[in-house]
């Protein structure tokens, strides 16, 4: 095996060019076995094998600096830069993260996981190189839908003025996570169709030199192209036409499904753990499709992640023009929603919590200042969500709950969520965001009759005394568990409250609690600093009421175990009861 002898890029250069396809197959074989057992980003890495080999064959990493956009396609890069055991040995699968990580290797320059940042980051590396009078190539690798992000275009616009070495590899696999959208990708398609020769060329229009490689999975063709641009004294774009999922038939056929995979059977491609249970994604899709049938003003919006709302390809076709994918452009999605709402439409925007930070300015400026009645639903904003440091869902409460005019809601069950949607999609007075609970969806079959238009009215679900536990969203179930344990262990009949609202206080209820309670406990699925519980504590201020806030510490966690994090933050019923009894 060639791969077994690769301990760094210098070993790649020792292999004859006509033998490199054999190593490419070895890389795919290793990726296939690992993915079948461990899961991970699949299609992006299978499509980038030859390009990665060619990069390390031609350039001198780490002197020549390679920056991968999103870096979800960096598995072959890691295999060629001293980390192959993490892909060859099951015992070492967890030795590396799913993204580039400077703590792992000198060949990784940034910890990244969000799209469209590579050109700007690499431009910074190039600018610093020039200021210090150094040499060396700087390469940004971007594609897989990332060009649709505003920062990518901003970076291209700025980079044209550098007038020094800067190489941008555009990995064009004709896909984002799902299909591509927008005029930019029409131009890429035209460039592919004309072998890069059409006069209508986005990159040339921006003043950039341009090279096209039609055989983007031909390592010899790539090496030839990269050698031509190596040590260039100005910015050049190398546009490579690749096949997402190349080398594994199911992934080539169903590119969207195989963007990311869990463990699967190699022979059939079928997942080992096929989750057919109803979840918030499927519930959302079913709700919106039904609403669309009777109301042409309803619009579902995604920013490149349609299945987060349950909109698989067939569901998107069913929705027709009432489903909009703006590409990986969260800012545009929010501003678009505001415009639709102002002109009488009923926009619904679904987004992962980790990507909410990219929307902050538009939520504040374009939506909330204008009081546009959009509905924005936040997925995986939870300790139970994605656990990579680049994709944490802990920060949406402090971010969104402090924007004026926004009503931010937190259901605990399917029924509460649907009731909130019924209200939000029809009301025209407020921008509304809904934070979905983490973990498996809970459905209790109850009929929710609450009028959410009467803002900031909490619900007392169990009346007690001395101790009141306010459990927000995900942790409403934990509030009930802690109350039950308090009764069993100390005979304390605690009050349990479902607050529903993240953005406002039920001051009448909180004041009433002073009559026969001495301690209020708040539980929230997010960072405590600037969060929900702090607002409760501030309300009680100088009163005699003790307030105990439970949530997460302000820190970046990476590949964490959810149960361990909960215990570390005393977010178990046993720990909460122990804490309460220690101060009683």
Q: Over which residues does each language-model region extend?
A:
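N-terminal amphipathic, basic-rich helices that act as targeting or association modules
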Residues: 1-79, 215
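Glycine/charged-rich beta-loop-alpha catalytic/anionic-binding loops adjacent to active sites
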Residues: 29-36, 95-111, 133-139, 312-327, ...
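Non-catalytic terminal/interface segments that mediate subunit docking, oligomerization
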Residues: 248-357, 362-372, 470-473
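A glycine-rich helix N-cap at a beta->alpha junction
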Residues: 86-96, 161-175, 368-380
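Cofactor-binding active-site loop characterized by glycine-rich and histidine/acidic residues
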Residues: 41-162, 298, 303, 312-313, ...
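Active-site nucleophile and cofactor-binding loops and adjacent substrate-binding regions
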Residues: 39-48, 67-72, 101-120, 142-146, ...
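Glycine-rich ThDP/TPP pyrophosphate-binding loop and its adjacent helix/strand module
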Residues: 108-264, 270-277, 282-284, 406-517
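Peripheral docking tails and interdomain loops at the edges
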Residues: 263, 271-274, 385-387, 398, ...
